[in-house]
């Protein structure tokens, strides 16, 4: 373990792109991770890996995924890739082990339960690297949409629907919500005074 592994407050942010949403049928085609400190400052970006799949697999995706992954360039990156699921998992775990010990960070991101389900089936070693808890920005978004619509509408994602851009968006989105959390936002959280 590297010298820069410290404390339990670092956060591992992750996103996956998949061929679809069915964990029994679909597959991970891209993975990216970022490690931040507790104040959401980026400490390191992990490898952004397209995972090799056949043209037949990509063509079997639904129309939304085919169009999106062609537009983002992921389609071609997947076809050109030689990286297997096992290699992507090993490279990601190796990166994370340089920054945070296993079990210390919740899995962080948007709609992260879906990512966790795919990891459990296809990259179980990586899934076990996380604490069992999740830091799901989607939960905060859903609460804000219902309880503070102006706060929710104040953030617009800029994502290209690639794993790394989605991870960056998740971090930026939590930074946005944090400024409205008062004392829950921490030292750098700011907050709205009534």
Swiss-Prot record:
The keyword Cytoplasm applies. GO terms for cellular component: cytoplasm. Belongs to the oligoribonuclease family. The keyword Hydrolase applies. It comes from Xanthomonas campestris pv. campestris (strain ATCC 33913 / DSM 3586 / NCPPB 528 / LMG 568 / P 25). The active site is at 132. The lineage of its organism: Bacteria, Pseudomonadati, Pseudomonadota, Gammaproteobacteria, Lysobacterales. The gene is orn. Residues 11-174 form the Exonuclease domain. This is Oligoribonuclease.
């Amino acid at each position: 373990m590297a010298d820069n592994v410290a404390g339990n407050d670092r956060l591992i942010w992750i996103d996956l792109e998949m061929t679809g949403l069915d964990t029994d049928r679909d597959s991970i085609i891209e993975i990216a991770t970022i490690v931040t400190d507790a104040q959401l400052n980026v400490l390191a970006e992990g490898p952004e890996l397209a995972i090799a799949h056949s043209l037949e697999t990509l063509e079997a995706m639904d129309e939304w995924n085919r169009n999106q992954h062609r537009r983002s360039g992921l389609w071609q990156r997947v076809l050109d890739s030689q990286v297997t699921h096992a290699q992507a998992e090993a490279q990601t775990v190796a990166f994370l082990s340089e920054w945070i010990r296993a079990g210390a960070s919740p899995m962080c991101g948007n709609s992260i339960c879906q990512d966790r389900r795919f990891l459990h089936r296809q990259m179980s070693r990586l899934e076990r690297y996380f604490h069992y808890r999740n830091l799901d920005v989607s939960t905060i978004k859903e609460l804000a949409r219902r309880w503070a619509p102006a706060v929710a509408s104040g953030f617009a994602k800029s994502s290209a629907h690639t794993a790394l851009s989605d991870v960056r968006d998740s971090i930026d989105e939590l930074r946005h919500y944090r400024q409205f959390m008062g004392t829950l936002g921490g030292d750098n959280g700011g907050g709205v005074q009534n």
